[in-house]
């Protein structure tokens, strides 16, 4: 969001592809669980994921933002977006989980149905590449890039 990140990383009760998960190592599965949990927390408007799952030195760039952002910016915009948007349904589609030492890259697509404060509904799709660093035995988001696909 992973998600909110952008319009979406506030989302997601993710569903994973069983076939993909069956071919992953235990460490890859662990990373996907972290990703899945972040989307679920964001969808539930539980912003504690920012303090518990994001590295203090995070720098990320969502497709809908004018420049890279830091953790303070993430908190500010997630609070705003969470107050103005509700996720109705979401699904994640894992593509890859690559691990090298204490760094991991997770790539996936998503689909989110949401409702804004005006009660207008919209379904969007998009993609993210998230990078994690393992510190103290935990995987933390250190950067990500992506967001909604362009409107057709």
Q: Where in the sequence are the language-model features?
A:
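Bacterial N-terminal signal peptides
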Residues: 6-15
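Short beta-strand edge/turn micro-motifs at domain boundaries
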Residues: 105, 125-151
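Positively charged n-region of N-terminal signal peptides that target proteins for export
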Residues: 1-4
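Amphipathic alpha-helical repeat scaffolds
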Residues: 36-40
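Boundary at the C-terminal end of the N-terminal hydrophobic targeting segment
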Residues: 16-21
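Short beta-strand segments enriched in hydrophobic/aromatic residues
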Residues: 54, 110-112, 145-148
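Beta-strand elements of well-folded, non-transmembrane domains
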Residues: 112-116, 132
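A solvent-exposed, acidic/Ser-Thr-rich amphipathic alpha-helical stretch
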Residues: 25-30, 41, 46-100, 107-109, ...
């Amino acid at each position: 969001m992973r998600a909110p990140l952008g319009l979406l990383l506030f989302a997601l009760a993710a569903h994973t592809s069983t076939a993909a998960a069956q071919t992953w190592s235990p460490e890859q599965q662990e990373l996907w669980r972290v990703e899945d949990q972040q989307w679920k927390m964001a969808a539930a408007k539980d912003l504690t994921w920012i303090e518990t799952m994001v590295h203090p030195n995070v720098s990320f760039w969502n497709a809908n933002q004018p420049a890279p952002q830091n953790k303070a910016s993430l908190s500010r915009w997630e609070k705003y977006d969470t107050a103005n948007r509700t996720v109705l349904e979401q699904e994640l589609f894992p593509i890859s989980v690559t691990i090298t030492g204490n760094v991991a890259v997770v790539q996936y697509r998503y689909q989110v149905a949401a409702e804004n404060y005006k009660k207008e509904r919209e379904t969007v799709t998009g993609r993210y590449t998230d990078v994690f660093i393992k510190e103290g035995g935990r995987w933390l988001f250190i950067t990500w890039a992506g967001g909604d696909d362009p409107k057709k």
